[in-house]
Amino acid sequence: MAPIPKTVGRIKLDCSLRPSCPLEVAAAPKLCKEFGPEDYGEEDIVDFLRRLVESDPQGLHRIHVDGSSGRLQLWHHDYLLGHLDDEGKSTGQSDRGKGAEGLGTYCGLRKSFLYPPQESEPCPQSPSASATFPSVSDSLLQVAMPQKLLVTEEEANRLAEELVAEEERMKQKAEKKRLKKKRQKERKRQERLEQYCGEPKASTTSDGDESPPSSPGNPVQGQCGEEEDSLDLSSTFVSLALRKVGDWPLSARREKGLNQEPQGRGLALQKMGQEEESPPREERPQQSPKVQASPGLLAAALQQSQELAKLGTSFAQNGFYHEAVVLFTQALKLNPQDHRLFGNRSFCHERLGQPAWALADAQVALTLRPGWPRGLFRLGKALMGLQRFREAAAVFQETLRGGSQPDAARELRSCLLHLTLQGQRGGICAPPLSPGALQPLPHAELAPSGLPSLRCPRSTALRSPGLSPLLHYPSCHRSHPNQPLSQTQSRRPHPLKPQDPSKGWDILGLGLQHLSQAR
């Protein structure tokens, strides 16, 4: 059913404002007129609004709905004159079929919202006008733009100092972390070294002649103790040395040292062979040069040498001569200048039935310390094992000149008995030892002191004193005499000059005198 229009034609707008009014007078929207149900009656509100819009061809008026009363309000806008005329027309034409709610809008927004008024004075006729059309403040147009900061010279200096201080703090912090990590590594390395050097020590040596001699007879041990006391283990030098000891294998360190001294050792061996003819007391061979090493490395090597010496002495006292030879050989690689190590290894070789090796070690011990009583005794025992009784008797006589030696007197008596038997047989010496004599003998018995001793069929293999603590290094030459040996092991026995057979009875006479004195 089509609505019945109440009126036809344009609606007469009784607006008090005219287009000719000055802008400053009508800059703000003014309420012109209100429309209610009594104005459009039964007419369709859409048709009424269309006629209302057509009555304002210049687009100076806007229609709003009062939220409180629900009446239509006609507002007058002079600032849209000439600026939004065309836009108002196009908007009115496009919104004709959309009802009153879509009239005069752009994308759902009123033109009054898109283009706010230029003055902030609200309309005096309606209190809702100020809320519907908010005023534009000058502060909205004054946008704060970013500006370049102007820094003074004092401020720049202060900022520079702060940056430098912060950088220094970061450097100090990094340095502290580095030092802390370094200390932790040093502490761990020191613990590993102490754990390595603090291996289970050998059982305490039994009392007897085989115990190490006292301090006057142990100059090497005294020197080691003094050197260890003089070292400051907390110093940086010692810590660096210990680090090198922990990183380098022992064999590599020793081989490096041995490569630096082969020439000196060869000269010492030649001079020792040339001076064999003179009495042992007059021998003064040139000792081989020492390996240049730092105090820290020397202290660690000496400590390991002492540990291996104790182990070797313990094995020798219990009759394990093969194992003792291995330990003494390892100890000699760490401390090749200790004459006691060669004497103890000579003792083990003599007990194993290897007189040639025993003679070589005894000669080296006397080279390192000429006139050493235990070295002379070991030399005599090795000569007895080689059936060279006349030379052995001369060595035992030299030993007795240094003081009372019951063992030397007993061995001298045995040598004289062998020489007497040879003289009765027409001066024919006993045949040399067979190759089997160099092998260890299986028979063993306990000596009076409780130490096992080997029974030798050709000589009285009595227990000989003089075992000393030795040091450590891996190599074994006891079971492979034909293989190339290290420089400390490659010394072959130098044949002593045989004496005139006519002097044999002189030796017997001197031997009897020494035997009577020893008793």
Swiss-Prot record:
Residues recorded as bearing Phosphoserine in the entry: 278
Span list, region Disordered: 175-230, 253-294, 474-506
Gene3D superfamilies listed in its UniProt record: Tetratricopeptide repeat domain
Segments annotated as TPR repeats: 305-338, 339-372, 373-406
Compositional bias per record (Polar residues), positions renumbered to this chain: 481-490
Annotated Pfam families: TPR_16
Stretches assigned to coiled coil: 147-197
Ranges of biased composition (kind: Basic residues): 175-187
Alphabetical keyword list: Coiled coil, Phosphoprotein, Repeat, TPR repeat
Signal peptide: none
Taxonomic superkingdom: Eukaryota
SUPFAM superfamilies assigned: TPR-like
Record field: transmembrane: none
Protein's UniProt name: Tetratricopeptide repeat protein 31
